[in-house]
Amino acid sequence: MSSVGDFEEIILHDLKPYYHVPGAIHSEGITFVKETGTLLWVDIFKGEVHKVEDIEQPESSHSFFSISRANYGKNASIEYPPNPDELKESVGCIFPILDGASQNEIKQVLFGSKFGIGKLDFSKSEWEYVILYSECPELSTDRAYKLRSNDGNVSPDGKYIYVGLMSDFPFDLEPIGCLLRVDLLAHKIELVWNCLLIPNAIHWDESDQKTMYVTDSLNFTIWKCPGGDLLKRDELIDVKNSNNQSFESPEPDGSAIWFSKDGKHSGFLFITVWSTSKVQMFDLTNGKLLKEFILPEQTPRVSCCCFVGKDLFVTTANAEINDAVRTNTDKNGGCIYKIPNVLDGNVPLESTKRQPLH
């Protein structure tokens, strides 16, 4: 359904990083929390949860927590799952919790990790699983063991966490990934989309709060699912054929959705396109490419984005994610960019993810 006609190209080759954590490998899942002014993101490969409490002063307000077996809660209600190969923890996506948050500080988050949905308490410096993916009836134990969390989001009513799983780093990439729907209150997990390679960003249409937009990275496709019916999906955007034909694998990765408050626009999707240094803006009505933001060529692995008011924050990944021996030649990948004034007009600050019921 997508089309490529006239579109605007915005060259940002001289843009400097907003912030770069030393040693960052795969920054992802960037999220803004309006209530506390907090910017959150993860490093998937290193299994880290990062936060900046003062966006204007990231150097002085940045902190992070490394998820590992060693700091798993001693009194956790769920025992740490069997891990005979001692696979590393990873963190694919993050969901803020406002319960107990002060005016300017997030104290707890939920997150998609290696074996399930975890909960981190920054004040206690420990974490625990609140539900395991192996509890999903449709997932065998062996299959669940080979998977890890990728991207995810919270349904408009807050009831469900939708999280995509894909092959974990030590394993070959296979179509054993899936999309799960997690109900934390009922302690229930359902498999709602099977046999995926890399499920990615998930959004809902603001008009009906039901229609879903789901990213299928290695099919280079954004699917539109009217009424939230994942079985009745229509191709909305063909990313590979949206001015990306010159790239070997221009995979749509994380994205940000925006709906105007004046009713003049039906909505736009801003997609980070892995391996291209691009963020592309599409019209949700017809899948038409409207703009391209071309980031510095030193960081082709753009991975996710979110809005803070008018500004778009973009995460990137390092060139050496899966390398057994790191040469540390990539000094740029893993940084975060801030593209100013991407949106026009009076744009209020809004949180980019809902708090899930838990």
From Swiss-Prot:
Name of the molecule in the record: Uncharacterized protein YBR053C
Annotated Gene3D superfamilies: TolB, C-terminal domain
GO MF, one example: calcium ion binding
Position of the signal peptide: none
InterPro entries reported in the protein's UniProt record: 6-blade_b-propeller_TolB-like, SGL
PANTHER family recorded: REGUCALCIN
Family per record: Belongs to the SMP-30/CGR1 family.
Native source organism of the sequence: Saccharomyces cerevisiae (strain ATCC 204508 / S288c)
Further comment found in the protein's record: Present with 4190 molecules/cell in log phase SD medium.
Highest taxon of source: Eukaryota
